[in-house]
């Protein structure tokens, strides 16, 4: 468990920051650096950093309101559907070309971005032909007990179902497999004798051994099997998604929780694992009680139309997964919304996950779709008093425009006479900084994976003429599967063309680029410097020019040579030399992100596959489900979630500054002022 308190220091007064968050700095209090004037802090005897051992972010002004660094993830809300008469319609499989079917652009957007928002309802009926990628034990005693704990289909007696399966088991062909010549049930037959859901003795709780996730716009629903076997699971579930961006596909991932007692002997696992690295990874996860990823699929959806009526996109459609390990029967309906204004009353408040002088952040559930989000409430009077209206509106603008799977998306924004509200995807895998602190450093493949996803996120911002300016592990979240989610856009600079320069002194001391320290003005290339610093820190545990004394650290950034530990990867070293060039015009990425993409360090990556989240992340955060709040400080989560009443009058001229705040999936809605009611 780690503290998230430091994430909520932004937007607080200077006195609050010093009193409550002095631990965020190195041992002693460090003043924020302004206008290129650095003040020396006291030394700490230890150079090992913790989550409280970090230089503070340098804001453009003392009163900057920077978005709260919250962890969000997707909801897994589903309801039961009993319309399970799955008819056979056309089958979709991995041979379909998504580029042709769904009109995927380089950023994953559909061609028509102007159609209205709405709700997409997915009905999941059943699965078929699922197999496991490995054989299992042939022990009848183990399999009989497992079958007896399984859940039968509706209206069928469990004893008859178990007897039928046990009878089949007695006739199944046992094969001598592997170097150990072990008697095993083949992978093709194994799934027929493992229940998809079990009920432990003395318990009425269902424990699914097979489930899959449906992801749309960083919101995730978890669909768990209710009955049947892994080969033929029954689901009968409904899940509804809010559609605010017309993305061209759904991402489906299938997972299994296989009891380790079903695996072949340790000797067999070791010998076969030496021959097949992927198989060894599967065995390692099962033996560590982790879920294994079986298969995936990207289902094309066409939401680019103008219609006020509900439309069925798929009707009892069979989806064959990419690797052919099974298929799923679904229907999908889309219903355009009426673009009615939202209010806080449209959400159930679940938990407080952060607080500050600006207001609070809560985990909420949208009442109509039952999807879980993070809602950030900001008091208007606070940001007016801090002269931060422009920055806050800019933050909302960036969040509404970004279109990248590795950036936390804005789902909605709305306002009342007293407050502004952000509704964002809820991502709960924790800060990258926490995971880096816990492990010290990452291996090469893990660091490469995170760097590649961040490269896509920064490139997406640059294409929108936005400079991020504050890349660091604290501003990077992991979703429940382990993908990157970039957050905190309070220091972004908008309307920055390729050759434009700005000279605002802001960022985080360890990550400041030389041109920023010299006050020469900087371009988008400043983000590639910070990407290099982050990659170096992930591989070594510390930023390249780190020093306890801030002025000394700045001097190192400007003058000291880049040093690498012994045995450092050659391609990683060459990439870092390019990214950490002190001359921004010679820095890798100065002429565009493709310069970085084409570097040998990423030669084994398919960028198209990466953008579609087609790679299995190297690490999956330890969260029980997509609503898990264990990565948030209990000081917040224990508090009763309420939207506190604010009795603060703001004049009409002040209220007009917040015009255009509302976002429900398009930018056509203006801002209507209705006293005492929710404001659009």
Curated annotation (Swiss-Prot):
The annotated consequence of residue 504 to A/D/E reads: Reduced sphingolipid biosynthesis inhibitor drug myriocin (ISP-1) resistance. Defective in growth and endocytosis
What further fact does the record state?
Present with 2950 molecules/cell in log phase SD medium.
Q: Where in the sequence does UniProt note compositional bias of the Low complexity kind?
A: 59-71, 84-97
According to the UniProt record, where is the region Disordered? Answer: 1-117
PTM comment: the record says:
Autophosphorylated. Phytosphingosine level stimulates phosphorylation by PKH1. The N-terminal half is phosphorylated by FPK1. Phosphorylation is inhibited by exogenous addition of phytosphingosine.
This one is known as: Serine/threonine-protein kinase YPK1
- Reaction(s) catalyzed by this protein? L-seryl-[protein] + ATP = O-phospho-L-seryl-[protein] + ADP + H(+); L-threonyl-[protein] + ATP = O-phospho-L-threonyl-[protein] + ADP + H(+)
Q: Which PANTHER family match?
A: RIBOSOMAL PROTEIN S6 KINASE
Q: Which residues form the Protein kinase domain?
A: 347-602
**Does the keyword section mention Metal-binding?**
no
Where does the record place the catalytic residues?
470
Residues bound to ATP: 353-361, 376
Originating organism: Saccharomyces cerevisiae (strain ATCC 204508 / S288c)
Give the compositionally biased regions (Polar residues): 73-83, 98-117
Q: Which family does it belong to?
A: Belongs to the protein kinase superfamily. AGC Ser/Thr protein kinase family. RAC subfamily.
